[in-house]
Amino acid sequence: VAQAVILAFSALLIIPSALQARVQGGNKKPSLSLKATPAVSFAPARVVVVAEVRGGADDNEEFYCPTVEWEWGDFTTSTAEADCEPYEAGKSQIRRRYTVEHQFKNPGSFRIRLMLKKGTKVISSANALVQVRPGLGPPGGDQQ
């Protein structure tokens, strides 16, 4: 009887990886972080922005196949929609990383905002600040 109890207890300690992910916070809502590089530059500035979805289950239905909307802070926006297969619990995988490049032609402070949306509902958003300083002018141009 003691051996049966020990074996049953040992079997409980061996948790399949998918179940283990859920036990370790996989049911928590993922969070979104945003980083712009470089954070400070000269106009015209080419900035690379990386967004990461952290935490939560890899098959989180709410974060599966969202519309991705970027507000650049310079009165322009970008939107992307993926053509995804229908969601299947335990099979569908959320995208964990979004990378995009944007050019700021004029100097200023810009608040970049990324929104992940399902229809019109924002499911998560994140912000990053970029500072673009006046450029030195055209190469070989007169500096007055």
Please provide the spans of the model-predicted regions.
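Extracellular/lumenal mature domains of secreted and surface-exposed proteins
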Residues: S17-Q144
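Bacterial N-terminal signal peptides
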Residues: A4-P16
